[in-house]
């Protein structure tokens, strides 16, 4: 496994991360039945990835994304919290909602997330996220309080990620790209501002 420094966070993460969609169950009716391992099975899969060198685990809040946080928390407890980097997120855009989401995620995980993203930020919610006591302000507040280590914005829109790259409150960005859809990634690679932030890519296999 190869590793990279994640921007200026000081985190060194595996090039291949573990996204927790394949281990979740509950409240996700669009997923087929095989996406339903129990906790023991889910922990075994995550441990196998860890033994192959993966140290970055990306999840999202219960209940919207099933029980993945709970299973990841069980894995972190078994393997040792200091051995992995936990990236978490919630699709909330106001400051109050985001603040409460982080508290709930921390309870589900049984530990403090390393990175927490406002998830799937779109043009309809962009100004809310970056505005006065929006999600960005709440994440910065949570970081100052030690409830998360780093702040993040996740989006499918280049202009929103660029806005995050210009924002001193934001440490890490997350966008989508894969071998079939490289348009946004190519633009990001050409923009020097993105080199000042950590960047995670999701949907690299055009799946979860």
Which residues make up each language-model segment?
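N-terminal binding-site loop/beta-alpha segment at the start of enzyme catalytic domains
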Residues: 1-84, 144
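Beta/alpha (TIM)-barrel catalytic core signal, keyed to glycine-rich beta->alpha loops juxtaposed to Asp/Glu
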Residues: 3, 119-208
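Acidic (Asp/Glu)-rich catalytic clusters
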Residues: 7-10, 51, 73-83, 102-112, ...
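Hydrophobic faces of well-ordered beta-strands that scaffold small-molecule active sites
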Residues: 14-18, 57-59, 84-88, 113-118, ...
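Feature marks short, surface-exposed loop/turn motifs that line or immediately flank catalytic pockets
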Residues: 22-25, 63, 92-94, 119-124, ...
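Short, acidic/polar
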Residues: 34-49, 95-109, 155-165
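Acidic-and-aromatic substrate-binding clefts and catalytic sites of carbohydrate-active enzymes
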Residues: 60-69, 91-98, 124-127, 178-185
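CE4/NodB-like, metal-dependent polysaccharide N-deacetylase domain
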Residues: 99-117, 141-145
């Amino acid at each position: 496994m190869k590793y990279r420094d994640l921007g200026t966070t000081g985190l060194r993460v595996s090039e291949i991360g573990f996204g927790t969609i394949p281990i979740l169950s509950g409240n996700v009716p669009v997923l087929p039945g095989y996406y339903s391992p129990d906790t023991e099975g889910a922990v075994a899969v995550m441990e196998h990835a860890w033994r192959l060198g993966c140290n970055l685990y990306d999840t999202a809040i219960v209940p919207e994304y099933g029980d993945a946080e709970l299973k990841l928390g069980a894995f972190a407890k078994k393997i040792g919290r200091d051995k992995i980097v936990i990236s978490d997120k919630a699709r909330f855009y106001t400051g109050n909602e985001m603040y409460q989401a982080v508290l709930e995620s921390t309870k589900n995980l049984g530990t403090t997330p390393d990175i927490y993203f406002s998830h799937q930020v779109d043009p309809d919610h962009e100004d809310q996220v970056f505005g006065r006591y929006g999600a960005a302000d709440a994440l910065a507040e949570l970081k100052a309080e030690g409830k998360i280590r780093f702040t993040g914005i996740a989006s499918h829109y280049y202009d929103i990620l660029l806005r995050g790259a210009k924002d001193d409150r934001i440490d890490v960005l997350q966008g989508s790209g894969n071998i079939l859809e490289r348009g946004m990634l190519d633009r990001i690679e050409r923009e020097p501002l993105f080199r000042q932030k950590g960047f995670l890519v999701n949907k690299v296999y055009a799946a979860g």
